[in-house]
From Swiss-Prot:
PANTHER family: DVL19-RELATED-RELATED
Protein name: Small polypeptide ROTUNDIFOLIA LIKE 3
Region named Required for DVL/RTFL small polypeptide activity: 92-124
GO biological process, one term: negative regulation of cell population proliferation
Pfam families with a match to the protein in the record: DVL
Keyword Transferase in annotation: no
Membrane-topology annotation of the record: Single-pass membrane protein
Recorded name of the encoding gene: RTFL3
Described purpose of this protein according to its UniProt entry: Small polypeptide acting as a regulatory molecule which coordinates cellular responses required for differentiation, growth and development, probably by restricting polar cell proliferation in lateral organs (e.g. leaves and petioles).
Subcellular compartments: Cell membrane
Major location category of this protein: membrane
Length: 124
């Protein structure tokens, strides 16, 4: 969307001499080749970058406020996927811990039964 801003249309892309810049060489055209109204919109000066960043910030805040842009939905999907992966990892970890505890209890129970059996067998 921002790339469209920098492309020249046939009416705006005319220089004083009548030449126009092609879209591929758009980046090499100088603002001195254009009249003053086009120079402010086409030159990549500090004010143009500030305007572009303000536009991007406003678009981002509008999308975050319920505008529902594609970039905001993809980033929210990415965050949702990360949260799911973290919860899945924690669930796997807790499941492994529960299984390890159960196995430990089972081994302890078997060892305790064996020891009690050996103690009882020695008494007879």
């Amino acid at each position: 969307m921002e790339d469209e801003r920098w492309k020249l249309s046939s009416s705006k892309g005319r220089s004083k001499s009548g030449r126009s810049c092609s879209s591929s060489s758009n980046y090499y055209c100088h603002s001195s080749d254009f009249n003053s109204s086009n120079a402010t919109t086409l030159s990549r000066s500090y004010s143009a970058s500030v305007t572009a960043s303000r536009h991007a910030t406003t678009a981002w805040s509008a999308a975050g406020a319920g505008g529902g842009g594609a970039s905001s939905s993809s980033s929210s999907q990415h965050q949702h996927q990360q949260q799911q992966q973290q919860s899945n990892n924690s669930q796997r970890l807790s499941k492994k811990c529960v299984e390890a505890v159960k196995e430990h209890r089972a081994r302890f129970y078997i060892v305790r039964r064996c020891v009690s059996m050996l103690v009882c067998w020695r008494d007879y």
